[in-house]
Amino acid sequence: MKRVILHIDMDAFFAQVEQVKNPALRGKPIIVGGDAGHRGVVATCSYEARKYGIHSAMSSAEARRRCPHAIFVGGNLTNYVYISAQIQDIMNDYTPIVEPTSIDEAYLDITESYHLYGTPEKLAQDLKDNIKKRLQLTCTVGIAENKLLAKTASDMNKPDGLNTLWMNELEEKFFPMEIRKLRGVGPQTEKALKRLGINTLRDLKDYPEKKLSQNFGLHGEHLSKMAHGLSDTPVHSFEEMEDEKSMSHEHTLYEDTSDLIFLKSLMITLTDKVVARLKKAQFLAKTVRLKIRYSDFSTITREVTLNSMTDDVNTIYKTALTLLPVDDVVSNKVRLVGVGVTKLHEAVETPQIELFEESSISKKGKSGDVVEDIRDKFGKFSIVRASSLPYRWEH
């Protein structure tokens, strides 16, 4: 049975909420963020302001220069969170499987419920109408068979849009797209792909996966899969996340940063903490997750399921690294990083190894056990990885 996934994206959410609160602001260029005279930045802006090239994370001074008659609003995060909760309540009326990814975006799995409305499109339109009727807010909805395509579909038709991107529509709608439109392809990856003669998603789809892997490592395999429109990441409701056995550690940075060396060293520290808990609880993990929250409070969560269960710190860390959206991190400062593992099972048996063959995994496992013994006896900072020192110097 094919999945049916919605991606809901509230249109210029903060600005819309301000316009609902003060109807005199409707139709005007609204900028939510710090005042231009106090080194502020744009949190978001109305579509009227976007016509002047204004966007999130732009300095307020530059925004003022581009649109001198723009109206700056300080914003009210408490009110935005309250309205966001009301939107989620409405979404929960259509399916219990709702995964918010930020204050103004969410994925819904409507595989089991869309038939109550006849078609996925009719359910999506009813949801849009309901949000507009109850809250006077518009949103854009993308409909597809997976999260990747649903998000892409919503990006195609903003604002106040409804768009599908089924597998049989890829030839017409998806493959002709420029590679920079693919989620996870930022400026640096785009340049590298174009050097290989890859300019569109069709080019990327047709490029040999083996060569992509040679150029981009594990990320190359991921790029090839996405270029074919494939993604098997499930929609996780809060209830599922709470019920699922998992362990994770997060860290909110004192100052937002795009420093990759710092972020990677922080990921090592977080992975160490997760693995220490795994070993202490005698669990093995099958799935690795990475969580990134940017300075604008948008959040992404990526995960990958391994071929076998593990509690090996190197395996988990290297897997988490493949999930790091390097280009996005470089262009958008990060405020929070989280590393986690799920699908846990008790480590009842020792993994079987080939007779007469030295196992590198076995050696790594033994060294990891020794490290944990030392930490238990002398403290968690008695032995650390050299590569995590850039992060530890800050603490």
Please name every model-derived segment.
Residues 1-225, 238, 361-395:
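Gly/Gly-Pro- and Ser/Thr-rich, intrinsically disordered tail segments characteristic of DNA damage-repair
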Residues 106-112, 301-304, 351-357:
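Short, hydrophobic beta-strand segments
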Residues 308-395:
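Acidic, metal-coordinating catalytic segment for phosphate/diphosphate chemistry
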Residues 13, 36-39, 295-298, 344-347:
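Short, charged/polar surface micro-motifs in flexible loops or helix N-caps
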Residues 145-148, 229, 284-294, 336-345, ...:
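A glycine-rich phosphate-binding loop feature that marks nucleotide/adenosyl-phosphate handling sites
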Residues 1-8, 100, 245, 340-350:
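Active-site-proximal helix-loop elements at catalytic-domain edges
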Residues 7, 181, 191-333:
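DNA-contacting surface of Y-family translesion DNA polymerases
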